[in-house]
């Protein structure tokens, strides 16, 4: 698994790109599921109007972002979907990387069951941040968990491929920050 030191890099854009191709692994209720990280978005606390911690705003919900890098920041979006972020950087520098999509690697049958995705297109199984959490069974219960534990971690192994960079999705409220190309996608089929 990746060591804690990997997550302490202050450049969240670098880490958002660097996480691509690594395998996100969960072992929850005795069931192992995993997938290659193929889409990420960087959120840079102090100066990013799309970030929950913009201008060093601190709330009960976003307080995990102020922790030392290497923990999970999971929150509810629209009160419905859990979204999984990797907290990065040193203590009190609120950066995080949203894991937007994975490519199933292990336990795909379990993911299909968790998402009730039988007889549906497999390429849509984990192609969104809420879908990732549902497929891997990540909930608010896993918020602040270390990413160096047997039940939640990211592998050292890494797949390669073509990386593209685009603006982030669904942040029209973020004024000039909405067009920053801080979304990274990995095509490992090339």
UniProtKB/Swiss-Prot annotation:
Stored SUPFAM superfamilies: FMT C-terminal domain-like (SSF50486)
GO terms, biological process: base-excision repair
Keywords: DNA damage, DNA repair, Hydrolase
Residues spanning the membrane: none
GO molecular function: alkylbase DNA N-glycosylase activity; DNA binding
EC number(s) from the headed UniProt entry: 3.2.2.-
Highest taxon of source: Bacteria
HAMAP family hit by this protein: 3MGH
Entries under NCBIfam families matching the protein: 3mg (TIGR00567)
Protein family: Belongs to the DNA glycosylase MPG family.
Descriptive protein name: Putative 3-methyladenine DNA glycosylase
Organism: Chlamydia caviae (strain ATCC VR-813 / DSM 19441 / 03DC25 / GPIC)
């Amino acid at each position: 698994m990746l060591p804690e030191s990997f997550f302490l890099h202050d450049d969240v854009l670098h880490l958002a790109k660097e996480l691509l191709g690594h395998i996100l692994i969960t072992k929850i209720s005795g069931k192992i599921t995993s997938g290659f990280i193929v889409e990420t978005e960087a959120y840079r606390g102090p100066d990013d109007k799309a970030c929950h911690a913009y201008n060093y705003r601190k709330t009960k919900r976003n307080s995990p972002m102020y922790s030392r890098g290497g923990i999970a920041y999971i929150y509810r979006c629209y009160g419905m979907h859990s979204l999984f972020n990797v907290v990065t950087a040193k203590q009190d520098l609120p950066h995080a990387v949203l894991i937007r999509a994975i490519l199933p690697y292990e336990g795909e049958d379990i993911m299909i069951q968790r998402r009730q995705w039988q007889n549906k297109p497999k390429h849509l199984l984990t192609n969104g941040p809420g879908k990732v959490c549902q497929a891997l069974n990540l909930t608010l219960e896993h918020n602040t968990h270390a990413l160096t534990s047997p039940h939640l971690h990211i592998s050292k192994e890494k797949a390669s491929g073509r990386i593209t960079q685009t603006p982030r999705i669904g942040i029209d409220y973020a004024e000039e920050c909405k067009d920053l190309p801080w979304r990274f996608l990995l095509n490992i089929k090339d």
